[in-house]
Structures are given as structure tokens and as C-alpha cells.
Amino acid sequence: MNVEERAAQAAAWKATGQCNCAQAVLKAFEDKLPVEADTLMKLGAGYAAGMGCMESTCGALIGAVMVAGVVTDGRGTPRISKELLQNFQEKCGATICKDLKGVETGAPLCPCPECVRNAVLALGEVLGE
């Protein structure tokens, strides 16, 4: 499966309510992760509505950083994390969940399924997929 297919599938999982944003990104890469699907869902469960219930980082971005850490065996993960953050911000307009959802402004920057899609695409770009 190529990164565009992974991104489309992850966005669909989020759009249909099958996963939260972090879980959808983790699930999109489950074939590359040495972790059982049930465990992946548990790892991502705390990031529904981003970290801290919309107060901090988008769950999709968190999921992408978790995947990066595993697939690179932790080598270069801080650099990759920074690149992911920059790439995601360029695509979505922010990295904080409440800003992306437009909680304070009433003007969402990027809907959740698109944040998920963009996180997967950003990860693919940073990892060279």
C-alpha cells in the first residue's frame, strides 16, 4: 500500500468514527509496526481530541511521531519529529487541536479527517515513502 492509499484509508477510519485521530494514523501503518492491532488502539486511545482534550498537540501528529519512532528504531526521531511538525503545520495551518478545530475562533483550519490524511502524508514525505 502506498502512502496516498494509507492516508485515504486513515481519513476514512476517522470520518466514520472507527478511530480517533491518533489511532487512525497508527492503524494506517500497522503492517509496518511490530505491535498487535489491539495494542495500537490502546496506545492511541488517550489522544482523542488531541493531547489534553484539545489543549495541545493534534492526535494525528502524535500518532505519526509514534510510528516514526518505531519504524526508525528511534534513530533520528527528534529530527523526524521536527520535520513532521513543520510539514503538518504547512499542510493544516496549526499543530494544536483546538486551533485546528477553530474552538476559539469559530473558523476551523482543518477538519479531523484531513488532519489524519495530512499526518500520514507528512510522515510518508519525511520517511521518503
Q: In which residue ranges do the predicted regions lie?
A:
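Structural signal for hydrophobic packing residues in well-ordered secondary-structure cores
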Residues: 14, 18, 29, 33, ...
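Polybasic, low-complexity association/targeting segments
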Residues: 1-14
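Amphipathic alpha-helical segments within well-ordered protein domains
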Residues: 11, 26-30, 44, 48, ...
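Glycine/serine-rich anion-binding loops at beta->alpha junctions
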Residues: 47-70
